[in-house]
């Protein structure tokens, strides 16, 4: 399981919308190269045009980080940005090492909210069920409260 969930706080949801235009492609197209004509095989069916536009507005979630000494930092984090990266942008220093979800240096424990940490492989399902997460590969999916500096709690 890759999604960790704590008691949920209400959060707005927004879906991504994709707009694209299709064009029919001919069965074959003649290309000339150095005076010679050659056929370029083309698969039949719809094609995405060069005007393909993907638009998805990131949803902002409030993230509260609680340090080992009780210090709290609160900031907004987009749902498409890692919590570690959003914290750094907000001026909050957190421990990290790999930035790839393959160690436990940035471990935290969530007491409220929901994150997506599907890119990680370090934590097992039991640890995630207990609310543990890795801030370097966790995207906020709802407002969150995360207790940081929890690496030693994992062992």
UniProtKB/Swiss-Prot annotation:
Sites where the protein binds [2Fe-2S] cluster: 98, 103, 106, 136
Protein's cellular compartments: Plastid, Chloroplast
Cofactor binding, note field: Binds 1 [2Fe-2S] cluster.
GO process annotations (BP): electron transport chain
This protein's record includes keyword Chloroplast: yes
A single Gene Ontology CC term: chloroplast
TM helices/strands, residue ranges: none
A molecular function (GO) term: electron transfer activity
InterPro entries: 2Fe-2S_ferredoxin-like_sf, 2Fe-2S_ferredoxin-type, 2Fe2S_fd_BS, Beta-grasp_dom_sf, Fd_pln
Primary site of residence: plastid
Keywords: 2Fe-2S, Chloroplast, Electron transport, Iron, Iron-sulfur, Metal-binding, Plastid, Transit peptide, Transport
PANTHER family per record: FERREDOXIN (PTHR43112), FERREDOXIN-6, CHLOROPLASTIC (PTHR43112:SF11)
Family (UniProt): Belongs to the 2Fe2S plant-type ferredoxin family.
Function statement: Ferredoxins are iron-sulfur proteins that transfer electrons in a wide variety of metabolic reactions.
Protein name: Ferredoxin-6, chloroplastic
Organism ancestry: Eukaryota, Viridiplantae, Streptophyta, Embryophyta, Tracheophyta
